[in-house]
Amino acid sequence: MAFDQAYYQRFYFNRRTAVTSRSEMRARARLISGCVDYIGLPVARILDAGCGVGMLRSPLLQRLKRASYTGLEFSDYLCQRYGWQQGSIETFRTRQRFDLVICYDVLQYLSAAQARRAIANLARLCRGALYFGALTREDWRDNCDQSRTDRIPGLRPGSWYRRELASAFRPIGCGMWVKREVPLTLWNLDAAA
């Protein structure tokens, strides 16, 4: 799949065909920042892996005022347009660790082997919380507006992602995961099932 100007025009810039909106991303940023605040996680560094057009950047930085933001993006077009760091979450390397890592709607584009390597890398890069989402087989069938979503062959079930993430992360709900070593008491009904 070509993540070029035509792709982003169709799925992000054209309001009639866009997969999301700025208002949805502002709400998502409120959710993310509210979760890290609730669990008492100070956030100094954010990695947005697959940041796309950067719709989370401003609303997150408005709420997490002491944080710096690193946008990692695979698309040459977006890196040239927005100045993101070019790379893939599967192979991205840095000495920095991030308090908050975001990887949303990225891994469904990778093969299972690539996605496993990406999840291992997310675990290496994250020292606090992960906000994670991927289009699953169940979402394609039951939830998404297929006229506004690109067709991705080989979608995996949600159980695949939960199983792969579980070795390094604990789910706390609403797409939020915390590293297993983070000292956090999760009450039984507060935690994701």
Task: Describe each model-derived feature in a short phrase.
Residues 1-96, 110-117, 121-124, 128-193:
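Class I (Rossmann-like) S-adenosyl-L-methionine-dependent methyltransferase catalytic domain
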Residues 102:
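A conserved beta-strand element that flanks and buttresses the S-adenosyl-L-methionine
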Residues 105-109:
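Short catalytic micro-motifs in class I SAM-dependent methyltransferases
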